[in-house]
Amino acid sequence: MDSKDRQILALLERNARLSYGEIGKAVGLAGSSVHDRVRKLEKRGIVKGYRAEIDFTAAGLPITAIVSLALRPASPADIPAKVAEFELVESCYSVAGDNSYALVVRAPTTKALEELLDALRAKLEVVTRSTVVLSTPFQHRPMLRG
């Protein structure tokens, strides 16, 4: 990966809807060259997909919580697969420290969050620790510099 690839990645990270021509103008390449480079980045697994940025409050999921899971001896071995069955869980991270997993949860109400926590504890034999997000000063901050 060279500096042009890094510049292309930085632009895509900020706005994945840019055309190849627009990216090309910004990095000094023809649109067709940008297209070729992006396809190679996709094939190498560096660019894994393109996503819409969703306003979860407007979409009916105004409650965001970080839920930590501490395993017990009776906890199943395939926690991530089991967690994926819960539709309110957006992300699951395997973490080091006192807990084994951290989940990002989006819920329509605090009651729905409470029901999810009860279900996680019952079905996964885990201890949960929850933090409800009050506000999000920033998220999805571009990390690549081009």
Segments the model singles out, each with a brief description of its role:
Residues 1-146:
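A compositional/biophysical signature of low hydrophobicity enriched in polar/charged and small residues
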